[in-house]
């Protein structure tokens, strides 16, 4: 059981009280004309063309700029904001850099920034380590497998829309913000951030240039103990981040517009603290020797560095249709923490640091036609190429052993995974038809062709042995090419019960190509005379990686009358295969076992008298794989957790306050690994100085200083516990922290 059982019960009572309160003192419902505006005023672009929410037969949430900025300035990350706002999006793990296992409806989502995919051939889970919240205009979340985007959208789409000059007031304006945060647990428990932007908006031209920076200090848990360093996916403690972003748009005429945008993002950890393994790694045999110590030095540190260019062109009159064109380029380098490897009889144990590079090119073209007032058709093509390479820094084991794992100096570099090139070409079409004044039908089809090229590769451990001089040569594991194709379909219907209420149902398919880099390039070798002879291997010719197809179903209801809003849905998704991460080798394995995820999600809010508003959200989810004796619980390494959240807010012309909480329910899998339950509360607020156009934001996070293991920490114990004692991977969340910031608009 978790360590917050009483807190969970209290929190459930807190949410129930909110729920009953929402119906007790609500204002009178808005009039009918206001109600129509409430449902139809929000337009989302997460699909292939802009659509009103009222036309879409699926669950959609929009987190607007005001909420994102208020929460971020009060000390929350984007992952935390979305995890507390989107019912079916898993909770964030405070302090973690990774988003691994932070699923949407129990499956990985496709993350987009202005429509450009942040997902790659290598599933690195750094998609949110990509942008400062200062630069975000809104986030659109489309839940469930998405046929129209196809690959790697089995959980849905999270589309991050950045701020542009066209969204600003006319003329030249500027904005600056600065803030700090601390839990006051030690002299290095201090975070700070600053950002600034200049915007220009005229009749034809618009532009925005911004820079945002952040530096974090030490992280402490609820008991006041320095958090253990995350040697698996790394944390954001002792981290420096910079996000430089610019865009320029030109309105050619009433119908045509072109826009260019670019970004440079760098997030790097540089810590004086490391995981102490004991003298000459004695803690691997005696886990009691593991501890966090100062004096850590390494010439290789965790980092996410990304550059991105994006150009879009729209023409509202191409033979009576709207043309949408987009071209994008993204390059990134992702580095991890030095990590132990068992090696083989020649290399012995060694430490390596993983560095993985991706170059992504994408082109998207779509035409939007409206042959009749009732029919809208969007059709087009996509093409993209993803090139991936990986290498590993090998460290001096003498220096590392003498320091107990606190001193890592590179002695050479070798390959880590085979190089992977994934090329995709797809055609798609989707239609929306207003069958009656109240009934809208939706349907779509996508045909996708994927070519994967895998390079020849010498096993990673064998390359290390050659570097060490303990071997002279090795056979290569053969690469090759493999092609995939899939036809994906979607169909749905939305029925408007009243001008403020809708019911909808949807079927959609998703396509997923599991991580090829961690699947290929694994071989068994024999060793003789300094040469490694390949005995057998996982390669393209003998055991090509199989794709996974997912069918997703949902029914839902939404209501928004301007005072009360509610959205709820039940869903079921079934995939034909399962992905397993080998606990000893960390290799990806594809298993011919069906995997299903089903659940119910909901979110409700109401505006009350005297400036109060309250809301609740919840998600009940089950993830199962099919075994010989029927369905059984999936591993906590990837299965989603159920959650319940709520808030009470109050605002007047100047001051706003919000007290919120979230309870994470315990989850145990078939192997008895557990994600413990916990409950967290936050208090955030802001005060606006109208005369100076300045806003003061503040926040208290983890108000009751709860000591808990994050969801990622529980997952990491299940995933990596075969390599070292599970205590090494028990990543806890931060204790009580305070944050304050000041924002000035010119």
Curated annotation (Swiss-Prot):
It is found in: Cell outer membrane. A motif (TonB box) lies at residues 40-47. Belongs to the TonB-dependent receptor family. It is a multi-pass membrane protein. Residues 52-163 form the TBDR plug domain. A motif (TonB C-terminal box) lies at residues 729-746. Pfam families: Plug, TonB_dep_Rec_b-barrel. This is Rhizobactin receptor. One of its GO terms (molecular function) is signaling receptor activity. The lineage of its organism: Bacteria, Pseudomonadati, Pseudomonadota, Alphaproteobacteria, Hyphomicrobiales. The gene is rhtA. Keywords: Cell outer membrane, Ion transport, Iron, Iron transport, Membrane, Plasmid, Receptor, Signal, TonB box, Transmembrane, Transmembrane beta strand, Transport. Residues 1-26 form the signal peptide. InterPro entries: Plug_dom, Plug_dom_sf, TonB-dep_rcpt-like, TonB-dep_rcpt_b-brl, TonB_rcpt_b-brl_sf, TonB_sidphr_rcpt. The keyword Repeat does not apply. GO terms for cellular component: cell outer membrane.
């Amino acid at each position: 059981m978790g360590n917050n059982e009483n807190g969970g019960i209290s929190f459930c009572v807190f949410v129930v009280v909110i729920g009953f309160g929402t119906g007790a003192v609500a204002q009178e419902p808005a009039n009918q004309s206001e109600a129509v505006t409430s449902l139809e005023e929000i337009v989302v672009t997460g699909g292939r063309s802009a659509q009103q929410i009222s036309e879409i037969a699926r669950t959609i949430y929009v987190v607007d700029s005001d909420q994102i900025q208020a929460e971020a300035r009060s000390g929350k990350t984007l992952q935390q904001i979305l995890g507390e706002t989107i019912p079916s999006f898993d909770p964030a793990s405070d302090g973690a850099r990774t988003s691994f296992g932070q699923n949407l409806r129990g499956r990985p989502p496709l993350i987009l920034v202005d429509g450009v995919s942040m997902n790659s051939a290598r599933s690195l889970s750094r998609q949110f380590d990509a942008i400062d919240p200062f630069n975000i205009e809104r986030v659109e979340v489309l839940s469930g497998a998405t046929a129209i985007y196809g690959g790697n959208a089995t959980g849905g789409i999270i589309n991050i829309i950045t701020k542009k000059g066209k969204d600003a007031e006319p003329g030249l304006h500027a904005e600056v913000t600065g803030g700090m945060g601390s839990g006051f647990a030690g002299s290095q428990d201090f975070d700070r951030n600053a950002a600034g932007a200049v915007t220009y908006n005229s009749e034809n031209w618009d532009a925005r240039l911004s820079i945002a920076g952040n530096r974090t200090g030490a992280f402490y848990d609820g008991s006041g103990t320095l958090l253990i360093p995350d040697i698996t996916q790394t944390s954001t403690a002792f981290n420096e981040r910079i996000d430089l972003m610019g865009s320029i748009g030109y309105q050619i005429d009433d119908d045509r517009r072109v826009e260019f945008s670019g970004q440079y993002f760098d997030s790097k950890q540089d810590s004086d603290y490391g995981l102490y393994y004991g003298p000459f790694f004695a803690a691997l045999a005696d886990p009691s020797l593991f501890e966090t110590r100062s004096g850590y030095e390494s010439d290789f540190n965790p980092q996410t560095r990304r550059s991105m260019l994006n150009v879009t062109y729209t023409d509202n009159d191409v033979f009576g249709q709207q043309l949408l064109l987009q071209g994008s380029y993204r390059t990134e380098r992702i580095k991890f923490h030095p990590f132990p490897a068992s090696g083989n009889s020649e290399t012995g144990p060694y430490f390596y640091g993983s560095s993985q590079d991706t170059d992504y090119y994408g082109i998207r073209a779509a035409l939007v036609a409206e042959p009749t007032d009732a029919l809208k058709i969007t059709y087009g093509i996509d093409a993209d190429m993803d090139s991936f390479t990986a290498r590993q820094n090998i460290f001096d084991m003498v220096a590392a052993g003498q320091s107990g794992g606190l001193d890592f100096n590179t002695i050479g570099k070798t390959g880590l995974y085979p190089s992977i090139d994934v090329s995709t070409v797809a055609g798609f079409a989707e239609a929306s038809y207003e069958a009656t004044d109240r009934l809208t039908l939706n349907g779509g089809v996508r045909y996708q062709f994927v070519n994967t090229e895998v390079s020849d590769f010498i096993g990673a451990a064998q390359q290390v042995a050659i570097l060490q001089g303990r071997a002279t040569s090795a056979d290569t594991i053969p690469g090759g090419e493999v092609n995939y194709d899939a036809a994906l379909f979607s169909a749905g219907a939305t029925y408007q019960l009243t001008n403020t209420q809708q019911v909808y149902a949807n079927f959609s398919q998703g396509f997923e190509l599991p991580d090829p880099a961690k699947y290929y390039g694994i071989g068994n070798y024999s060793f003789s005379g300094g040469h490694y002879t390949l005995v057998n291997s996982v390669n393209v010719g003998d055991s090509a990686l199989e794709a996974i197809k997912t069918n997703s179903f949902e029914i839902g209801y939404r209501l928004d009358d301007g005072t009360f809003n509610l959205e709820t849905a039940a869903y079921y998704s079934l995939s034909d295969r399962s992905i397993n991460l080998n606990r000893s080798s960390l290799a990806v394995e594809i298993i011919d076992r069906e995997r299903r995820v089903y659940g119910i999600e909901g979110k409700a809010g109401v505006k009350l008298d005297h400036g109060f508003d309250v809301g609740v959200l919840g998600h009940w989810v089950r993830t199962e794989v099919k075994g010989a004796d029927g369905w059984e619980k999936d591993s906590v390494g990837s299965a989603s957790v159920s959650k319940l959240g709520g808030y009470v807010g109050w605002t007047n012309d100047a001051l706003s306050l919000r007290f919120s909480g979230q309870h994470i329910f315990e989850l145990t899998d078939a192997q008895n690994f557990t994600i413990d339950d916990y409950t967290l509360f936050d208090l955030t607020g802001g005060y606006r100085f109208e005369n100076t156009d300045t806003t003061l934001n503040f926040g208290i996070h983890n108000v009751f200083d709860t000591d808990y293991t994050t969801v990622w920490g529980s997952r990491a114990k299940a995933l990596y516990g075969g390599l070292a004692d599970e205590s090494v991977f028990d990543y806890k969340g931060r204790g009580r922290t305070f944050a304050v910031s000041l924002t000035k608009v010119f």
